[in-house]
Amino acid sequence: MAAPAIYQTDKVLRFEVPGSRRPSTYFFALVLTLGGLGFLFAGLSPFVETNLLPFSDTRGLTRFPQGVTMIFYGALATLFSLYYWLVLALDVGSGYNEFDKQNKKVTLFRRGFPGKNRIIEIVHPLENILGLKVQIKEGLNPRRAYFLKLKGARDLRLSPVGQPQPLAAVEDQVSAIARFLNIGVEGI
């Protein structure tokens, strides 16, 4: 996963946070769509007494239980694929982290699902920042996350959710933020 784009001036530091538009999400959406439609057409073939799949022979399938079961699994996979395509279209989870010395604030912006929380924007004054916290866990389920420590509030996650970023990207971003805000880093 590539490091998010950086926009930096002497007054503003901005990191783009990638959302759901990753190659793995496109892959799963495509596989679920093709597999779900394949199962759906295979399950419907015994009911319409026509082979709806030109690359396969469905004459051996019976209406019950095989046809009904394949229709059920095909419909379920198609619904899941619709969810994936919706998440991709809305780019859920994408946004930016912006540190603004001129307006003396930090802004965390993310896109969500339609409704009350479609746009998530968290703004804190720079004076409330205590430092950065880094959590690095290697092994079978690696975790590489960094948080903004705030006075009187819980830690805010700055790193993207999903696949862990490369260690070099985490170090670059954390050091850029720490240098820009002149704050300390704990956990390294």
From Swiss-Prot:
Highest taxon of source: Bacteria
Q: Which InterPro entries match?
A: PSI_Ycf4_assembly
Membrane topology field = Multi-pass membrane protein
State if Lyase is listed as a keyword.
no
Outline what the protein does.
Seems to be required for the assembly of the photosystem I complex.
Protein name, as recorded: Photosystem I assembly protein Ycf4
Q: Which family does it belong to?
A: Belongs to the Ycf4 family.
**Which residue ranges traverse the bilayer?**
27-47, 70-90
Q: Where can this protein be found? A: Cell inner membrane
Q: What is its main location?
A: membrane
A cellular component term, taken from the record's GO annotations: photosystem I
Organism, scientific name: Gloeobacter violaceus (strain ATCC 29082 / PCC 7421)
One annotated GO biological process:
photosynthesis
Q: Which UniProt keywords apply?
A: Cell inner membrane, Cell membrane, Membrane, Photosynthesis, Transmembrane, Transmembrane helix
